[in-house]
Amino acid sequence: MKRLENQVAIVTGGGTGLGRGIALALVAEGAQVVVCGRRQAPLEKSVQTIQLAGGEALAVVADISDESDVERLVQTCLQGFGKVDILVNNAAIDGGGSIHTHTVEEWDRIQAINLRGPFLATRAVLPIMRAQHHGQIVNISSESGLEHYPGDGAYGVSKHALNALGEYIQRENQELGIRVNTVCPGMVVTEMTQNSPGLDHSKCLYPDDIADLVIWLVTRRPNIKIGTPILIQTMENPWT
């Protein structure tokens, strides 16, 4: 029996890159998966890839920062698969630039996707997980959520806040068998980063590296808790 047999997972930002890699890894372990994102075509590609591998998946076009879209996402999961066991808050947008150069609109959009989105998704699944006395939430943050890189302010602030959100949710729900973990990757080669000038791909992480860690987190013994965000990096500086 596969380790996630009969488990149902939602992966936000599941149409490309890291999200697709995590979704495929969950399916390989037996989970049924709902992927969501803002673009139909990449989501359909993820579902097609999963189905060709013999898995089950649904796609939901949704803006993770929109409350009604998030409610529709969770309801689609319940209607399709009957429950929610795992939530992976992966959807995010980048936003380089110093704090003083950001427009209010840029700032608000970054916080909306990177922080409000995980809050809304988590709030939507927690009543389900609390009622069933089990559930796992994995937040995909960033090394920028642990460091303070100049020129990365709005994004970094959103990820620092996401780390804190995860710790609060863990402490508020652990007595009901709900685990919350936060993963802080270094530079990952994805659609968003692959054309970055000066980036040496051989010294970067790849989606499978993060997916492997997520699988370990959601398949370890139930009584094991990770107390702090997990930093995962390569051994070398990827910037040339």
Task: Describe the role of every protein-language-model region.
Residues A31-K45:
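Conserved glycine-rich Rossmann-like NAD(P)H-binding loop of the short-chain dehydrogenase/reductase
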